[in-house]
């Protein structure tokens, strides 16, 4: 499990090297601004920001009831669904959100969207982000290890679920001036929403479908943003 921490830090560290080795002062300034400027976060987006994930969990539990799911899923979970053995799980969830988004939204996604529409960049990024988690199925006691040993299909669902989640985080980030803070906070909300209630893996499969519907709705609602080409080529690396 000690190998998890360097793995979590890798996106951030690689991004720091790429950014600060660059001779582009604007790139460095933009990174610092998106990391520190809380005013980039739009108050009007906050209800969506805080409610998408908790509501997706609640809706998924209600749907699961029609397929034999239990009302006990509305109870608070007695503990986390995995263990680390070296740092508290809550701290790990926060570190995961922080280090991942510092790298992913701080540099990687920004680099992709300079070459592609937001839609295409989001799809590419989400698939790559999903695959990035794959080695964790071999890390004893990790969440991915636990669910893959419970059921191959539950493990597969985890990787599929990351794709609509990545699209949603991209939308949240873009709508808030590409704020890295917004991405970190939303990512942490995602992590906590999966742990706070006693939901089953079957319900999490249902949640993947719910998140896919939410993603399609966001794309339809903000089609102009997702498919705009106005921003292409504006960021040099």
Predicted regions and their residues:
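Specific transmembrane helices
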Residues: 1-97, 125, 138, 157, ...
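Small-residue-rich segments of transmembrane alpha-helices in multi-pass membrane proteins
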Residues: 40-41, 115-122, 188-194
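Alpha-helical transmembrane segments of multi-pass membrane transport proteins
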Residues: 52, 101, 161-162
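Hydrophobic/aromatic residues in alpha-helical transmembrane segments
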Residues: 59, 108, 165-169
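Membrane-interface helix/loop boundary segments of multi-pass membrane proteins
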Residues: 99-128, 174-179
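Histidine-centered divalent metal-coordination motifs
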Residues: 101, 133, 187, 191
């Amino acid at each position: 499990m000690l190998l998890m921490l360097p793995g979590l830090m890798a996106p951030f560290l690689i991004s720091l090297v790429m950014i600060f080795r660059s001779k582009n002062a604007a790139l460095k300034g933009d990174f610092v601004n998106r990391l520190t400027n809380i005013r980039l976060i739009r108050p009007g987006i906050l209800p969506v920001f805080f409610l998408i994930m908790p509501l997706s969990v609640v809706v998924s539990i209600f749907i699961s009831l029609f397929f034999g799911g239990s009302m006990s899923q509305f109870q608070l979970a007695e503990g986390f669904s995995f263990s680390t053995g070296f740092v508290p799980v809550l701290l790990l969830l926060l570190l995961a959100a922080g280090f991942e988004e510092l790298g992913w939204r701080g540099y990687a996604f920004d680099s992709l969207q300079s070459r592609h529409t937001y839609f295409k960049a989001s799809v590419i990024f989400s698939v790559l982000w999903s695959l990035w988690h794959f080695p964790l199925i071999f890390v004893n006691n990790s969440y991915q290890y636990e669910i893959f040993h419970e059921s191959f299909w539950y493990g597969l669902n985890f990787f599929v679920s990351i794709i609509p989640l990545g699209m949603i985080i991209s939308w949240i980030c873009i709508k808030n001036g590409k704020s890295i803070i917004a991405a970190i906070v939303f990512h942490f909300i995602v992590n906590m929403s999966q742990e706070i209630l006693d939901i089953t893996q079957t319900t999490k499969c249902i949640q993947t479908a719910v998140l896919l519907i939410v993603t399609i709705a966001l794309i339809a609602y903000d089609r102009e943003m997702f498919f705009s080409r106005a921003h292409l080529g504006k960021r040099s690396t």
